[in-house]
Structures are given as C-alpha cells and as structure tokens.
Amino acid sequence: GTITTASVAGANFGFALIWTLLFSVIATILLQSMAARLGVATGQDLAQALRANIQTPLFKSLAIFLVISAIGVGSAAYEAGNLSGASMGLIGIFPNVNPQIWTPLIAFLSAGLLYSGKHKVVENALIVLVILMSLVFISTLIMASPSLGDILSGFTPSLPEGSITTVLALVGTTIVPYNLFLHSGVLAAKHDSKSDLQKVIKQTNVDTSLSITLGGVITLAILSTASVGFYGTNAGQISAANRAVQLEPLLGD
C-alpha cells in the first residue's frame, strides 16, 4: 500500500506532496509515543484503558465501534492491499498464468506460514526483503539525482488539483490506527513496577522515532523516484505494468 501510494503521489504530482510525509511522520511519532507511555506506565494496552476509563454506555459502545473499525476493518483493508500488491507483481512476472489464482494462493500460503508457528522465519524473511527494497529505492534516488531545490519545495504545504485523495492515502498508509493498539500492548506486556519507567519511556521514544523516521525516508525515496521516472515525462500513467520505470536509473531497462 505504501509503495503504491507513494509511487502514485510522485508520478502524478511530482514532489508537491512531500510535506504530507513530514506531517504524517511527526503525527505517527507523537501518537505512538503516547500509546507507548500508556502501556509502560499503566500496564494496560489502549483497548484495556478505554474499557476501564469510559463508563457511559453510549460512549463505551462508540469506543468499541471505533476499536473494531481500527483493528478489524483496518487490518483487513491493509492485508487486502498487501495481497493485491503481491498479486500484481506476480502477474508481471508470469503474464501467461491466470491472474485470478494469485490472490487466493498467496492468502493460502500466508495462512499456512502463520499456522505453522514459524513466525521467526517469516519475520527474518520480511526483514531481508524490506532491507533490499529500501536499498534499491534509496540507491535509485541517489543515481537519479533529482534537483534538491525541487525536493525542498515539496515541504511547503500545497494541494495540487485532484490531490486530496492522494494526500489522505499518504496519511492513511503512515498513521496506522491498529499499530497504536499493538504498540501499547507490546509495551504493556513489558510493564514492571520495579523498572525505571522514565528510562523505559525515553528508550521507547528513541526507538519509535528512529524506526518511523527511517520509514519516512524510504517513502520519500519511493515518491521521489516515481517523480523522476513519470512526472513531466512521456512514460504515461503509472500502473502495475510500468511501475519499474522508476527504478531504471539503478536497474536499467
């Protein structure tokens, strides 16, 4: 989802929406830091804290609805995007295979991996893939050598015509609501009344800021390479079939 959204943003609007990434990164750091402090200080995750502190039945029902929307619907939409993205990649590699088989096949294989309990294998494989992807996009950005002035101009807030949905998509793929519940839950599980809570919170804030900032830099690289490859060129509209154009400065035709 992030790759597709950032690529579309760069291809259609150049560097004009970089400010959205900056806003999203700062907002995500603040929100996840608050969720982390809640988990560390109280030993409760965000859902438990909502249940314990909201007494009015109407507000409690509303909170339950919002939590279900953030975790259930949000996760389903996120995974649907992942499956669709993986399917589009395989369609490009195997154009003669019926494209309708890929999404259910990937879903079945993913469920099998989770059911096997070998989560560490999946985690390590994903880490390797993310590192490789990050290196490719950042290296491509360096080789493409876009104008620094154009990049810096993108930090000035603006809304080009037709960009509002892309802005919302960039924010939505960065500020992920269910991550707030996950983050607070992970920290709540580590809660220890004997620990130096201030030290734990400080370390958590540092880790959160570094990881989210790194993610923002990678997203910036994706947006920028798409801008160089598509915006103002004859490459046409970006699609699953021609998205590799943005990587040509590094990988060639």
Residue ranges and their predicted role:
Residues 1-24, 238-242:
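Transmembrane helix-boundary motif of multi-pass solute transporters/channels
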Residues 6-8, 34-59, 88-90, 233-248:
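Flexible loop linkers connecting adjacent transmembrane helices
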Residues 20-54, 67-74:
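Juxtamembrane transmembrane-helix boundary signature
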Residues 29-41, 187-191, 195, 213-242:
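Extracellular/periplasmic helix-exit of transmembrane alpha-helices
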Residues 61-95, 103:
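Hydrophobic transmembrane alpha-helices that form the core helical bundles
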Residues 65-68, 93-115, 132-141:
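Transmembrane alpha-helical segments of multi-pass small-molecule transport proteins
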Residues 84-93, 106-128:
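Membrane-water interface regions at transmembrane-helix termini and the short interhelical loops
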Residues 130-156, 171-185:
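Hydrophobic alpha-helical segments and their helix-loop junctions in multi-pass secondary transporters
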